[in-house]
Amino acid sequence: TVRVGLVQWQMRSYKTLDDLFEQVEFFVDAVSDYKSDFVLFPEYFNAPLMSKYNDKGESQAIRGLAKYTEEIRDRFINLAISYNINIITGSMPYVKEDGLLYNVGFLCRRDGTYEMYEKMHVTPDEIKSWGLSGGRLLQTFDTDCAKIGVLICYDVEFPELSRLMADQGRQILFVPFLTDTQNAYSRVRVCAQARAIENECFVVIAGSVGNLPRVHNMDIQYAQSGVFTPCDFAFPTDGKRAEATPNTEMILVSDVDLDLLNELHTYGS
């Protein structure tokens, strides 16, 4: 059995990275207290730091936010070791050596190693407002308790990506997302449930809630984070293992049994 924790993150103003990470560490501490193996943060959870660049255009502001990314990664690596938990850092903007801007995140293992994952399908708004480019890196990751994959938000709406990961033996799919409206959220949620059923895996989604004044293009958020399962006799009849309260800051902790997946692959309905 693997225990997963997710953070339904409230957007609020933070003046500094230290302020933001006081809240981050609080959640890592809280989730690790429940002996979780993983903690998942949402897409662009660090967006409040863009308020510092509020006088700039949107494409400049997001590049300002990207300046924090490497330090954020290093802080997460330290937290993963300190609290003995594998951290999936949601996502954040990152400027690669080619000078282009990508939406990426990191798996920070509790042994101190890390991996990077990339959003491959950036949304029309990410292109128009921020000038983001889509990544090309698709891979699964070995951890001390499960083989996992991460798809950032919109990417979960493309069945092929998850299918390729399933072929590599992925057992748990993590989906950090950020959606502003309920219809946008429904696209992510329904597709996440579809991926759990068609690929016979667990899918964990985490998003942000609340409002964010003084950050352009980030005004409102809507989320109901959750843990989804295949639909068969050994699983919940509706494929929902656990769900957060909609639009409320909270953590959700849930156990998933990987042995049930092996049984399903062989003897499922």
Question: Model-derived features: where do they sit?
Answer:
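Cys-nucleophile CN-hydrolase/nitrilase-fold catalytic domain and related Cys-dependent amidase chemistry
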Residues: 17-21, 25-110, 180-193
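Short beta-strand segments enriched in small/hydrophobic residues
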Residues: 1-12
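A short C-terminal boundary segment appended to hydrolase-like catalytic domains
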Residues: 255-269
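CN hydrolase (nitrilase-like) catalytic-core segments centered on the catalytic cysteine
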Residues: 66-88, 157-249
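Short beta-strand scaffold segments in enzyme catalytic cores
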Residues: 89-90, 103-107, 139, 205, ...
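Short loop/turn motifs at secondary-structure junctions
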Residues: 3, 34-35, 84, 147, ...
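Active-site catalytic loop in hydrolytic enzyme cores
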Residues: 96-171, 181-194
